[in-house]
């Protein structure tokens, strides 16, 4: 019995991320292709689409930038440690090197929460 496209899609949709990753590897081996090369080829025309392509990419992933530590540097270092799980020295170095990215490629909600936490600690934060 042949499976329909809808049945195949339903089966794929029910897979976990790990199972899906393994499926992709198996398909790459079986057909001698690379999913990464296909993703680049598909993404290239979208990126050439101008501002619409850039705006679509920014809507899903955001970077939280520490613009400046402000007056209360100790609290900012504590906030950076909480957000990044860095050690004390690494967090201090990151705060001293501002403007610097604190979190990269996070969701909008996570970016806003991180920026709020930094601002509450006395820092100036930006979401890009």
From Swiss-Prot:
What does this chain do?
A: Forms part of the ribosomal stalk which helps the ribosome interact with GTP-bound translation factors. Is thus essential for accurate translation.
What molecular function terms (GO) are annotated for this protein? mRNA binding; structural constituent of ribosome
Q: Identify the keywords attached in UniProt to this record, alphabetized.
A: Ribonucleoprotein, Ribosomal protein
Encoded by which gene?
rplL
Protein name stated in the entry: Large ribosomal subunit protein bL12
The cellular component terms of Gene Ontology attached to this UniProt record, alphabetical and capped at eight, are: cytosolic large ribosomal subunit
High-level lineage: Bacteria, Pseudomonadati, Pseudomonadota, Betaproteobacteria, Nitrosomonadales
Q: Does the keyword Cell membrane apply?
A: no
Family according to the record: Belongs to the bacterial ribosomal protein bL12 family.
Q: How does it assemble?
A: Homodimer. Part of the ribosomal stalk of the 50S ribosomal subunit. Forms a multimeric L10(L12)X complex, where L10 forms an elongated spine to which 2 to 4 L12 dimers bind in a sequential fashion. Binds GTP-bound translation factors.
Sorted alphabetically, the Gene Ontology BP terms of this entry are: translation
């Amino acid at each position: 019995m042949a499976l329909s496209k809808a049945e195949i899609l339903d089966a794929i949709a029910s897979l976990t991320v790990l199972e899906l990753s393994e499926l992709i590897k198996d398909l790459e081996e079986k057909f001698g292709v690379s999913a990464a090369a296909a993703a680049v080829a598909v993404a290239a025309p979208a990126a050439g689409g101008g501002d619409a392509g850039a705006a679509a990419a920014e809507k899903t992933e955001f970077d939280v930038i520490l613009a400046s530590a402000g007056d209360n540097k100790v609290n900012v270092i504590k906030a950076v440690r909480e957000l990044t799980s860095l050690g004390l020295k690494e967090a201090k170095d990151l705060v001293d090197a501002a403007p610097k990215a604190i979190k990269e490629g996070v969701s909008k909600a996570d970016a806003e929460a991180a920026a709020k936490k930094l601002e509450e600690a006395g820092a100036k934060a930006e979401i890009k």
